[in-house]
Design a protein with these regions (language model features):
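Short glycine-centered helix-capping/turn motifs at secondary-structure transition points
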Residues: 92-93, 169, 254, 296, ...
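Switch/coupling sub-region of P-loop NTPases
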Residues: 189-202, 208-213, 242, 248-313, ...
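Short beta-strand elements
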Residues: 18-24, 279, 383-386
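Basic, amphipathic alpha-helical bundle interface domains used for macromolecular binding and assembly
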Residues: 37-45, 58-60, 67-77, 286, ...
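Alpha-helical scaffold elements adjacent to nucleotide-binding pockets in ATP/GTP-utilizing enzyme cores
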Residues: 47, 51, 84-87, 123-127, ...
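Short, well-ordered beta-strand core segments
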Residues: 136, 299, 383-386
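Walker A/P-loop
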Residues: 216-255
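Peripheral, non-AAA+ core regions of ATP-driven protein-machinery
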Residues: 1-215, 219-225, 327, 466-467, ...
Length: 505
């Protein structure tokens, strides 16, 4: 007897509809799964058999062959347990095949028949909806996630037996309902808490307005981490499309635990011991790494020179292309990685080079070696280099608070609105996304600004990439000033942020 049903699995960040075909034939008892299953899928044989028996149903003592189509796509994970079990029951006559038409089953089965959650449900349901499927069965633990998709009906039985009884019409089951979205909580940090650091806060404002990368250099305790953790408070809110994209990433990574869509921009701060795979993604079927988990948000790398140089070098492609490419034998994966990089470091191993109150104890060789841990090509991809010095006592004890995040966010939002309108023809949202064509058409300098940039370009022997990034930052500074013209003072300020690593004078 033959039957087929729909399941799904994730491949990278996207879901793929899988047709599960089951054939039961008169032969020596066997249970085989074909169609390029991974080890985790092959293990489902034991889970499915035990779940069916322990739910009170008969598992065929015949040859059971399960085919997972398309056969050229490697299937991974335990998400196909439930559809395999349902089609075995249909093929053996326990439930009518008709009730399984145009529905999709997603979930892992325990040995007792409990339906368990799996990561990536949002991507799976989106794939099913695109294939014309509107009814889904899954664990109650992930029903809320599935309901983030519009125009779908989700049922959430707790066990295999409960699901079969509903399909046979023996017991009722109401569709799962979407819970009311919780109100967005206010951030517990604010730029008003940062005393002094005028230039560093200005750099953060420019970074947020144009989505530019920042490197802060300063002694221990100068406030670099404090500044970095507050940048999300001035970034504009995510659009629904951006929020859905971030939610899908966290769902596939198994990090989505909420009932509502992720609305706050991600802030990722990996430790400097992270591996290359942890940063960009890895595995047989690669899972998202930190650069993808920071998509549409911020990636903060504290103590930048402490990261292995090989790990830092893999940042070059995502910083340039805003996506990361991972190749495997059977396929290539492209993950989004459009983030703002905020990096922080000490100026030397002891941390006090250039500090007027603490003498530096490092030798010239140690300082040079420390600076060489970060390659020139990586530094070239960082738009804003800012020195952060320890605040003075008078600044720390001042009763007048600094400018609030809300005030800064208003200026950032106005600048982003100008950029979005100016770049709408190319479907871009911010200045950092501009290419050569957009730079030529939207970022013309007057004669005075061009001459200033030419002098600095020739004196410092800047690269073409540095030239482009200076123009982009100048454009953002002009946007914050509310002017369509890039003036010499905007270019001058942008040039002031091209400082390289400090050296002993």
């Amino acid at each position: 007897m033959f039957a087929q049903v729909f399941g799904t699995c994730t491949f990278g960040l996207n879901g793929h509809v899988i047709t599960v075909e089951v054939d039961i034939s008169r032969a020596s008892p066997a249970f085989d799964i074909v169609g390029l299953p991974a080890v985790s899928v092959k293990e489902s044989k034991e889970r499915v058999q035990s779940a069916i028996r322990n739910s009170g149903y008969f598992f065929p003592i015949e040859k059971v062959t399960v085919n997972l189509a398309p056969a050229d796509l490697k299937k991974d994970g335990s998400c196909l347990d439930l559809p395999i079990a349902m089609w075995v029951l249909a093929a053996s006559g326990v439930i009518p095949k008709e009730v399984l038409a145009s529905v999709m089953f997603i979930g892992e089965l325990s040995l007792q028949g409990e339906i368990r959650s799996v990561p990536g449900v949002l991507s799976m349901v989106l794939a099913g909806r695109e294939a014309g499927i509107s009814t889904f069965f899954m664990s109650p633990a992930v029903a809320g996630e599935a309901l983030l998709c519009e125009n779908v009906t989700v049922y959430a039985p707790r066990t295999l037996g409960e699901l079969v009884e509903y399909l046979l019409g023996h017991s009722p089951m109401a569709p799962a309902k979407r819970r009311e979205a919780a109100e967005s909580k206010l951030s517990d940090v604010d730029f008003a808490e940062v005393q002094g650091q005028i230039m560093a806060k200005r750099a953060m404002e420019i970074a947020a307005a144009g989505s530019h990368n920042v490197l802060m250099t300063g002694p221990p305790g100068s406030g670099k981490t404090m500044l970095a953790r507050r940048i999300t408070t001035i970034l504009p809110p995510m659009t629904r499309e951006e929020a859905l994209e971030v939610t899908k990433i966290y769902s596939v990574a198994g990090l989505f635990k909420a009932e509502d869509i992720i609305r706050e921009r991600p802030f990722r701060s990996p430790h400097h011991t992270i591996s290359m795979a942890g940063l960009i993604g890895g595995g047989t079927i690669p899972r998202p790494g930190e650069v993808t988990l920071a998509h549409n948000g911020v990636l903060f790398l504290d103590e930048l020179p402490e990261f292995p140089r090989a790990v830092l070098e893999v940042l070059r492609q995502p910083l340039e292309d805003r996506e990361v490419h991972i190749s495997r034998v059977n396929a290539s994966f492209v993950y989004p990685s459009d983030f703002v990089l905020i990096a922080a470091m000490n100026p030397c191993p002891c941390g006090y080079l250039g500090d007027p109150d603490h003498p530096c104890t490092c030798s010239d060789g140690e300082i040079r070696s420390y600076g060489r841990k970060i390659s020139g090509p990586l530094l070239d991809r960082i738009d804003l280099h800012v020195s952060v010095m320890r605040p003075k006592y008078s600044e720390l004890t001042a009763t007048i608070k600094g400018e609030s995040s809300a005030r800064i966010a208003e200026r950032v939002a106005a600048a982003r609105a100008m950029q979005s309108e100016r770049l709408s023809e190319w479907h871009m949202q911010n200045n950092a996304q501009m290419g050569h064509r957009q730079l030529r058409e939207t970022c013309r300098l007057n004669a005075e600004g061009s001459e200033l940039l030419r002098e600095v370009f020739e004196k410092l022997h800047l690269s073409a990439r540095s030239y482009d990034r200076i123009i982009k930052v100048s454009r953002t500074i002009a946007d914050l000033a509310g002017t369509s013209e890039i003036k010499p003072e905007h270019v001058a300020e942008a040039l002031s942020y091209r400082n390289m690593l400090p050296r002993r004078s």
